[in-house]
Regions:
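Short flanking/linker segments adjacent to small metal-binding domains or redox-active Cys/His motifs
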Residues: 84-85, 91-96, 119-156
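Immediate flanking context of iron-sulfur cluster ligation sites
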Residues: 22-32, 60-82
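Short Cys/His-based metal-binding microdomains
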Residues: 94-104
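N-terminal, Lys/Arg- and Ser/Thr-rich interaction peptides
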Residues: 2-42
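Short Fe-S-cluster ligation motifs
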Residues: 64-79, 106-138
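Local cysteine-cluster metal-coordination motifs and their immediate loop/turn environment
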Residues: 30-45, 75-93
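Small-residue-enriched alpha-helical segments and adjacent helix-cap loops
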Residues: 34-72
């Protein structure tokens, strides 16, 4: 600090600190849809197709009208291990928590895509309750931590 006359000046330069969003924000997100989810244990298929396959078709129809967020993708999978609570979808992205929703119906297709947008924009996969579409609230059944960027402790 310098003193000039009666004024005291701080000569230390103040660098502006920019807060950068973590690299996980806006990372490509993938929506996984379980094709093998059944309608019920009593009625596993309708017209030789499972409920998961119908949900996948409904989601694809919505995507034709409104594309996925940039670099995001859709992947049909054989099983998401939520067989007691069909239909199931999951969301994954680098550096973000993985999320699985269960008890979904064909009517949830648009809400699944709305949530994908919120998940894509989230910092670490924690989407505020207010941003979760009404039809998905209370249906989050699995939350897994993001995988480590690199292994710190390796098994020997």
């Amino acid at each position: 600090m310098r003193q000039s006359g009666s004024k005291v000046r701080n000569t230390t330069s103040r660098a502006k600190v920019r807060r950068r969003k973590p690299a996980s924000v806006r990372q490509p997100a993938t929506l996984y849809v379980c094709r093998s989810c059944v309608w019920s244990e009593a009625q596993r298929e309708r017209d030789d197709r499972r409920q998961g396959d119908f949900l996948l078709e409904a989601i694809n129809q919505k995507i034709e009208r409104a594309p996925l967020p940039q670099n995001s993708g859709l992947r049909a999978v054989h099983c998401l291990n939520g067989c007691k609570t069909p239909c199931n979808v999951a969301f994954r992205a680098p550096g973000k928590h993985g999320l699985r929703f269960s008890h979904l119906t064909l009517e949830n297709a648009g809400e699944v895509l709305s949530f994908l947008g919120a998940y894509f924009e989230s910092e670490v996969g924690n989407v505020p309750e207010a941003d979760i579409p009404e039809g998905l609230r209370g249906k989050l059944t699995v939350r897994t931590p993001p995988p480590p960027i690199r292994s710190i402790n390796r098994l020997k």
